[in-house]
From Swiss-Prot:
UniProt protein name: Acyl-protein thioesterase 1
Annotated keywords: Acetylation, Cell membrane, Cytoplasm, Endoplasmic reticulum, Fatty acid metabolism, Hydrolase, Lipid metabolism, Membrane, Nucleus
Organism: Rattus norvegicus
Record-listed N6-acetyllysine modification sites: K224
Keyword NAD: no
Gene label: Lypla1
GO molecular function: carboxylic ester hydrolase activity; lipase activity; lysophospholipase activity; palmitoyl-(protein) hydrolase activity; phospholipase activity
Superkingdom: Eukaryota
Function comment: Acts as an acyl-protein thioesterase. Hydrolyzes fatty acids from S-acylated cysteine residues in proteins such as trimeric G alpha proteins or HRAS. Acts as a palmitoyl thioesterase that catalyzes depalmitoylation of proteins, such as ADRB2, KCNMA1 and SQSTM1. Acts as a negative regulator of autophagy by mediating palmitoylation of SQSTM1, decreasing affinity between SQSTM1 and ATG8 proteins and recruitment of ubiquitinated cargo proteins to autophagosomes. Acts as a lysophospholipase and hydrolyzes lysophosphatidylcholine (lyso-PC).
Subunit structure: Homodimer.
Length: 230
């Protein structure tokens, strides 16, 4: 990867305390790194699960006056009708699929992997889960939206994850990605995957961030879908 400006440092990893039989891949938000989320998962970890928090490559972001910062894809605007970086989103999804493949090579089947993320990372996790042929255990999407929503059919998706479990979380005081985005996204998701498996949790007073209750809800979701198998 030397000389490629898309390269990013190795992910922050919280290793399993014993043999890893499941994994969580969690994607941070715009301008962040995986380190803070790795610390958060270290606080709610289970001994058989490996938690992988990759770092986005650094690129110019149109929304922020083309300043260079860690970003999974370019963000042009934050309104519902903003133009989207279609090629960048699709390329980023391929990067995430490669991370999933790497864990499968390490001996963890894809249906023992949960994909998740916060804000831009959550958006990418939803898009990847809905477009990959890798069957996943679930998605945990925090304070985010569904990118390229017009590219999805009106009916259920015809892919491996039409019955996937989704935990979507949002703060009701989010000034950056308004709660309405989360509400619209969850309604769209219920048309794309089995609606019985979609859970939407709203946290009173929470802004564009996380909170202790949300992390406990994430832990419960992960531990329920990825129980120990030995």
């Amino acid at each position: 990867m030397c000389g490629n400006n898309m390269s990013a440092p190795m992910p922050a990893v919280v290793p399993a305390a014993r043999k890893a039989t499941a994994a969580v891949i969690f994607l941070h938000g715009l301008g962040d790194t995986g380190h803070g989320w790795a610390e958060a998962f270290a606080g709610i970890k289970s001994s058989h699960i490996k938690y992988i928090c990759p770092h986005a490559p650094v690129m110019p972001v149109t929304l922020n006056m083309s300043m260079m910062m860690p970003s999974w894809f370019d963000i042009i605007g934050l309104s519902p009708d903003s133009q989207e970086d279609e090629s960048g989103i699709k390329q980023a999804a391929e990067t995430v699929k490669a991370l999933i493949d790497q864990e499968v090579k390490n001996g963890i089947p894809s249906n023992r992997i949960i994909l998740g993320g916060f804000s831009q990372g959550g958006a990418l996790s939803l898009y990847t889960a809905l477009t990959t042929q890798q069957k996943l255990a679930g998605v945990t999407a925090l304070s985010c939206w569904l990118p390229l929503r017009a590219s999805f059919s009106q009916g259920p998706i015809n892919s491996a994850n039409r019955d996937i479990s989704v935990l979507q979380c949002h703060g009701d005081c989010d000034p950056l990605v308004p709660l309405m985005f989360g509400s619209l996204t969850v309604e769209r998701l219920k048309g794309l995957v089995n609606p019985a498996n979609v859970t939407f949790k709203v946290y009173e007073g929470m802004m564009h961030s996380s909170c202790q209750q949300e992390m406990m809800d994430v832990k419960y979701f992960i531990d329920k879908l990825l129980p120990p198998i030995d």
